[in-house]
From Swiss-Prot:
Phosphorylated on tyrosine residues by SRC in vitro; this reduces the binding affinity of the protein for RAP1GDS1. Heterotrimer of KIFAP3, KIF3A and KIF3B. Interacts with RAP1GDS1/SMG GDS. Interacts with SMC3 subunit of the cohesin complex. The keyword Repeat applies. Involved in tethering the chromosomes to the spindle pole and in chromosome movement. Binds to the tail domain of the KIF3A/KIF3B heterodimer to form a heterotrimeric KIF3 complex and may regulate the membrane binding of this complex. It comes from Homo sapiens. This is Kinesin-associated protein 3. One of its GO terms (cellular component) is ciliary basal body. The gene is KIFAP3. One of its GO terms (molecular function) is protein phosphatase binding.
Length: 792
């Protein structure tokens, strides 16, 4: 059958269910439209059904509203609701009236993840109801004067706000072309007109498939020009207002000036309301278009970040939510973040924390979280006083998680760790730790606590009362490696807090076995290794918990993961401070095992440094010193490592070799010779080269070359030494013994005692002021001062 035979169209509307809107004060009316095409004889040719819905917004509904009257009015005005449903409407309205505004946490999260659509506003709300069939009339209005253009655009906007109409509007190229032209030509003539037309295109921008249409008409670029213009206008308004305010302040008795100022201020307020409606819809359109990163880059090149940061000075919550949401999206790219830094964004955001508007506070915290990945911006956050403000939010379940993440990032910087001691942060965190019912504590919470425990002042607060006891109890109960890592950080600080651990040495030592999880054992070992307490009987601990076989077994290459082996080495270094422990370890054959491990891990500076430190501890004790010097090749390894590129390794080597040299003359000579050779290597090479030049006739023989450099002991060659007047006479008037009165460290004369044998001894029989255990990748020693450069 041909199309022209279809002469008649029959439309039937059938009412359906009525529901309440999930988040707004509104009713949703469901209805069904059945369209049937009738033939010439009235018989149906083609039919289609479509389910639709209408939203009835009830702006005036509040606690004092007369529900019965409002229900009657709704039924009378909405033809889709049958009068028989009056009681149902009344019940729904009663429910809306009494429904709490606060949503559940999950709903809030979903709701705040995207700003709300712009509401109806002046110029958009007209009495006339738009009809899709009257589009030609509305298009004609766009060719008339400004008031008619505003009316025409408002009617088209009514249609565009219903997503069901968008596809039909998309096909109407005449309408879209006219709207784009009017916006381009007349946006400066009327804010209402510009707002209406941008809102129409915003409706299209809510759906990704229509973004090509907006790009085609270059609406995005036009919106950016409009936003830039409006922001500059706002600055001019503020300047004018400021001048008039200043005039009033200078002459408070002048009523004419005061009235003029009040009139200007009232006008300014009206203009700002309309302007913010325009800014909001234009920015929302751009935010939707920014789904495409290429489009976002174009916006960035047109200074979108500067515009958005300027808009942060506004007071309109809905506009601010949109602006901050946009900035949050942009902040994930470094270039945009750098633009935000230039505009001092942190200073502008700090005024929003805290604020009454939950959604704004939530999205602002999320933006700050993105920005807090930048070290300079974290510094700025502390400078502007965000630390106590964020700490105060830890008590609010809605913001606790995000605030904690920002604070965690701030706590990563050692400069700011101590500042947490002057806030209410630590008591709140301890409360959260102890109230946590799960076996594993939230990762954000425990990570934050681990960072804070790296600072001595914070640790004093953590250990107040039964703090440490409660932490130990929980860590041992649940075998939590992260909580034990926090305890390990606590244990590294010298002073009263370290002595608290004496009560838990047995509990910790009992965890050192192959039966426990390796991660947990690593942290327990690390905690024990930090306990450099003179009164602690390490020999008793090693024997009672049978730790020596465990430690020796783990030293075998490949016996365990490197992290665990390293902790074992550090633990051996700690217990080796005790004379009886060092002897116990030497008897067990741990020293050869350490040398074997040193060979296997010679490329790993951290392993090398910690193993050398064990040797350093052991050479203080007679039993282990003799084993190291006479039965192992440890001194030879130390000589090889004397000039390692790692400063920490060199330092430990020097100190260890100095002690070996004091107790063994043969090694003393080798060590001193090597130090001299290294320190003067450049000069020795030059002398050797000169001697070679003078002795070219002996080039193929060793007679003249041998005595100079290659074979003899350098310290037996006084003819190569300098004195204050130049080279010492070659006849050897000064004996090498002259140099035995000086302590050479890396070749530098540092004193007139050979080696530090006369230094005072501490509780372990060690010289006072000797070097401490070298830092590991785990962290710095607690008593090591920090020096930081404060960048601009």
């Amino acid at each position: 059958m041909q199309g022209e035979d279809a002469r008649y169209l029959k439309r039937k509307v059938k009412g359906g269910n009525i529901d309440v809107h999930p988040s707004e004060k509104a009713l949703i009316v469901h209805y069904e439209v059945e369209a049937t095409i009738l033939g010439e004889m009235g018989d149906p040719m083609l039919g289609e059904r479509k389910e639709c819905q209408k939203i009835i917004r009830l702006k005036s509904l509040n606690a004092n509203t007369d529900i019965t009257s409002l229900a009657r009015k709704v039924v009378e005005e909405c033809k889709l609701i049958h009068p028989s449903k009056l009681n149902e409407v009344e019940q729904l309205l009663y429910y809306l009236q009494n429904r709490r505004d606060s949503l559940s946490g999950k709903e809030k999260k979903e709701k705040s993840s995207k700003p709300k659509d712009p509401p109806p506003f002046e110029g958009m709300e007209i009495d006339e109801v738009a009809n899709i069939n009257d589009m030609d009339e509305y298009i004609e209005l766009l060719y008339e004067d400004i008031p008619d253009k505003v009316r025409g655009s408002a009617l088209i906007l009514q249609l565009a706000r219903n997503p069901d109409n968008l596809e039909e509007l998309l096909l109407n190229e005449t309408a879209l072309g006219a709207l784009a032209r009017v916006l381009r030509e007349d946006w400066k003539q009327s804010v209402e007109l510009a707002t209406n037309i941008i809102y129409i295109f915003f409706c299209f921008s809510s759906f990704s498939q229509f973004h090509g249409l907006i790009t085609h008409y270059k609406i995005g670029a036009l919106c950016m020009n409009i936003i830039d213009h409006e922001l500059k206008r706002h600055e001019l308004w503020q300047e004018e207002l400021s001048k008039k305010k200043k005039a009033v302040d200078e002459d408070p008795e002048n009523q004419t000036l005061r009235k003029d100022y009040e009139k200007t201020f009232k006008k300014y307020q009206g203009l700002v309301v309309k302007q913010e409606q325009l800014l909001r819809v234009a920015l929302y359109l751009l935010l939707n278009l920014a789904e495409d990163t290429r489009t976002e880059l174009k916006m960035r090149n047109k200074n979108i970040v500067h515009m958005l940061v300027k808009a942060l000075d506004r007071d309109n919550f809905e506009l601010l939510i949109l602006v901050v949401s946009f900035l949050k999206k942009l902040s994930i790219f470094m270039e945009n973040k750098n633009d935000m830094v230039e505009m001092d964004i942190v200073e502008k955001l700090v005024k929003m924390i805290p604020c009454e508007h939950e959604d704004l506070l939530n999205i602002t915290l999320r933006l700050l979280l993105n920005l807090s990945f930048d070290t300079g911006l974290r510094n700025k956050m502390v400078q502007v006083g965000l630390l106590p403000k964020l700490t105060a939010l830890l008590g609010n379940d809605n913001y606790k998680q995000i605030a904690m993440c920002v604070l965690y990032h701030i706590s990563m910087d050692d400069r700011f760790k101590s500042m947490f001691a002057y806030t209410d942060c630590i008591p709140q965190l301890m409360k959260m730790l102890f109230e946590c019912s799960d076996e594993r504590i939230d990762l954000e919470l425990i990570s934050f606590c681990i960072n804070l425990a790296a600072n001595k002042r914070n640790v004093q607060l953590i250990c107040e009362g039964n703090g440490l006891k409660m932490l130990m109890k929980r860590a041992l109960k649940f075998k939590d490696p992260l909580l034990m890592k926090m305890i390990r950080n606590i244990s590294q600080h010298d002073g009263p807090t370290k002595n608290l651990f004496i009560d838990y040495v047995g509990d910790l030592a009992a965890q050192i076995s192959n039966d426990e999880e390796e991660e947990f054992v690593i942290e327990c070992l690390g905690t024990l290794a930090n306990l450099t307490i003179p009164d602690l009987d390490w020999e008793l601990v090693l024997k009672e918990y049978k730790l020596v076989p465990y430690l020796k077994d783990k030293l075998k290459p490949g016996a365990a993961e490197d992290d665990l082996v390293l902790e074992v080495v550090i633990m051996i270094g700690t217990v080796s401070m005790d004379d009886s422990c060092a002897a116990l370890l030497a008897k067990s054959g741990i020293i050869p095992a350490l040398i074997e491990l040193l060979n296997a891990q010679q490329e790993d500076d951290e392993f090398v440094c910690q193993i050398i430190y064990v040797f350093y501890q052991m050479v203080f004790h007679q039993a282990t010193r003799d084993v190291i010097i006479k039965e192992t090749q440890a001194p030879a390894y130390l000589i090889d490592l004397m000039h390692d590129k790692n400063n920490e390794i060199r330092k430990v080597c020097d100190n260890t070799l100095d002690i070996i040299a004091e107790y063994d003359e043969e090694w003393a000579k080798k060590i001193q010779s090597e130090k001299f050779r290294w320190h003067n290597s450049q000069w020795l090479e030059m002398v050797e080269s000169r001697q070679m030049d003078e002795s070219e006739q002996y080039l193929y023989g060793d007679d003249r070359i041998e005595p100079y450099i290659h074979e003899g002991d350098i310290l037996e060659r006084p003819d190569l030494f300098y004195n204050s007047d130049g080279l010492i006479a070659s006849e050897g008037a000064i004996s090498p013994d002259f140099f035995n009165d000086y302590h050479l460290q890396n070749g530098d004369v540092v004193g007139q005692h050979s080696f530090p044998g006369s230094l005072g001894m501490d509780g372990f029989g060690q010289p006072v002021g000797i070097l401490g255990r070298p830092a590991t990748a785990y962290g710095f020693r607690p008593d090591e001062p920090y020096y930081y450069g404060y960048g601009s």
